[in-house]
Amino acid sequence: MTFSEPQKRISSAADVDSFKRSQPYATIISLLDKYSSTVQEHLLPPNEDELAASSKALVTLCRKLSALIDETPPLEGPRRFGNVAVRDWHDKMEAQTTALLTEAFPSINKDSIIELQYYLHGGMGSKQRLDFGTGHELSFMAFVGGLQKLGLLETDLPAPDVLFIFETYFVLVRKLIMTYSLEPAGSHGVWGLDDHSHLPYILGSAQKVSRSVTASTLLVPTKYDKECPPSSVMNPRIVQQQKTTNLYFAAIAFIYDIKSGPFYEHSPILYDISGIATWAKIHSGMIKMYIAEVLGKFPVVQHFYFGSELYPWKDTEGNDLPYSKVEDEEPVKPKLPLGFKSKKEPQTTPHARLPLMGPRGMPMETVERLARRDGQRAAREKEEREDRASGGASGTTGAPGATALPPTRAPGSSVPGGDAPGMAPTKAPWAK
C-alpha cells in the first residue's frame, strides 16, 4: 500500500456529483447500513468490559483526547464565536496523534498514519472555524472505517463495540462543544434536525428496529414501538431512563441539557418526528436525510479529503475521477469603489465623480434631502398646532365626526407558527 496525504477534490457542485460515483461514497453508505443492521435490537452496554481488545484501545484513545480538554481550559471572558483555546487543544492532539495511534494499535503501518490522522483530526471539529457539525461526524466514521480496512479493528464489529465506540465519541465531542462553545457547522437553524449531530439519531433509531421488519412493514408497530414509542422523547423522565442504553435518547437528553423552552419551538423537526408511529420508519427517514443533507451537500462534503488508499478519489471500478482545480473556479469580481468605472468604460478623474461628503460620511445630497424633509415636517406640525389653538377640529383626537383609524398591525402569517410568508417548514424525508 502506498499512502499519501489526503487532498481536496470537492470544489464545486460538479465534484459532488463525481463524489456520488466514488468508492468512498459507496464505502460510507456501506458503513451506515452495516452499523445500523448490526445494532438492531441491541442496547448500549454499561461499560467496555465485553468489547474486543482493539475496540477498547479506540475507546481509550478517545478518553485520552477527553483528558486533553481538562488540561486545556477555555480562555476567560465572553466570546461570540467559540473559544480560541480549542485551537490549543487541537495543537496538542495533533502533536500526540502518532504516539496515540501507535500505542493503541501497536501493529499499525506507520505509513498509514498520514491518512488515518486526517480523519481523526477532522472528526473533532474545525480548528479554524471553531465549529462542529455533521461533516465532522462523517470524518470520524471514516476514521473508524479506515481502522477496519487496515485490520486494526474487527471487520465485523459486534453491536456492543459499535455502540460503545460511537457513544464514547459523541460524549467527547459534546464535551468539546460545551467547553469551547463551538458553533454549529452549516446549521439549518431551527429547521435543522440537530445543531451538531445526525449519526446518533441513525444508530439510536436502529437500536429500536426489530429484525423482523421489512420494507413493506415499516409502519407496522413492533414490541419496541409499543414498549417505548417515538413520542417518548417528549417525556424528560423517560429520556433520562433511556439515555444510558440508547444513542437516540442520549442525543435528545443533550438537547434538554443545553436548550430551554418548549421542545416543539427549539427542535421542531425532532418534535414532528416524535409523532411517527414506528422506529423503523424513523430510521429509514434518517438514512435518507443523511444521504441528502450530509453526503449530498457541497458545504458539508467539500471538507472531506481523499488519500490514495483508504478513501481514494476513484469510481467504483477503480478509475480516477475528474475534479475541479481551484484555479478553474470562476474568480469573484471585486466591487469597484464608488465613482470608479471598469476599464471597459471611459475613465474620468476619480475624485471628480465622488459625491461631496457631509457629516458622518453622508453625501451632501443626502444631507440636503433630509434637511428639506425635516423642514417640511416642522412646517406641518406648526400649522397643526396653530389649527388646534384656533379651535379647529383638524387633527383633534375624538373630535365629532372624526373617523378613527384602526391600529396598525403586521399582516397575518401565511405559515402556521408565525413564519414569514413563503417560508414553509422543511419536510423530513418520511413526511408524506
UniProtKB/Swiss-Prot annotation:
Pfam families: PTPA. Residues 366-389 have a biased composition (Basic and acidic residues). It is found in: Cytoplasm; Nucleus. This is Serine/threonine-protein phosphatase 2A activator 1. SUPFAM superfamilies: PTPA-like. Residues 322-432 are annotated as: Disordered. Its EC number is 5.2.1.8. It comes from Yarrowia lipolytica (strain CLIB 122 / E 150) (Yeast).
